[in-house]
Amino acid sequence: MSEAAFDYDGSAPLDVRPVGSRSADGITLSELTYAASFERRRAAYVFQPEGDGPFPVILYVHWYEPSAPDSNRTQFLDEARGMAARGAMSLLIETAWSDREWFLKRTQANDFRVSIEIVAELRRAMDLLLDQPGADPDRFAYVGHDFGAMYGVVMGSVDPRPTCYALMAGTPRFPDWFLYYPPIKGNQREAFRREMAELDPIDRVSGLSPAPILFQFGRDDPHVPVERAEAFFAAADEPKEIAWYESGHGLSEEAARTRVAWIERNLNLHSP
């Protein structure tokens, strides 16, 4: 497919509207809304360290797990606060799948189009992050879990602004998720696989090179079995690392510690 399919209007005003902010221990947490793509507004948090910068930046994109209280932009609040103490600015965004009923509302007939729109929204989020005072575009980490990891790969394959990626429990192909529901059979399933193949992360992850990638997987993940995870990792170019945890799809505190240390090294952050 033509990369022009991913075009978006990066010159459109972000129309940032502050909601509130609070400061403690030299760190400011701001809440805002902004103009995403396709006439949608999204909510976000920004963690700002004290000082004038330049600040390394991190874009956090949450997972989808309707039963989990952190299946939204709050997922990485504690991690982002810790990163601010290390000198990094972070943006934590609302997504299409912040709606807990999103998966059941969607259909295979619309998944390709909606996926293109999601990539455009992630690019707008990057615009917002890099528009923050003091943001350093040369030290930019992308952190995504589940759909956040998968769509982050597609985004990075067409817009290489992040300088490193931490990809958490992503599965290599969108039909791995989207064929769960609603049920379709036979030729419809194969036609859907062919349509989504143009977006599948496993065929786009090599496009993130030369940015370093950390892949994180749980050995007991019912959605991302070991063979899928290993195939995803194998498709990426160097530099890359893979880390396994005795956990399910939500990963673990050990995974968070590993990820923080890895980002700290790649963004050249200071210890808190």
Language-model-derived ranges and their functions:
Residues 64-120, 176-180:
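Cap/lid segment of the alpha/beta-hydrolase catalytic domain
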Residues 225-233:
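Short alpha-helix in the alpha/beta-hydrolase fold that links the catalytic acid
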Residues 208-209, 214-217:
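Short beta-strand/loop motif that positions the catalytic acidic residue
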Residues 234-272:
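C-terminal catalytic histidine-bearing segment of alpha/beta-hydrolase fold enzymes
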Residues 9-52:
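N-terminal cap/lid segment of alpha/beta-hydrolase-fold proteins
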Residues 219-224, 250:
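Acidic catalytic loop of the alpha/beta-hydrolase fold
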Residues 44, 54-65:
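Short beta-strand element of the alpha/beta-hydrolase
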Residues 123-183, 187:
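Primarily recognizes the serine-hydrolase "nucleophile elbow" in alpha/beta-hydrolase
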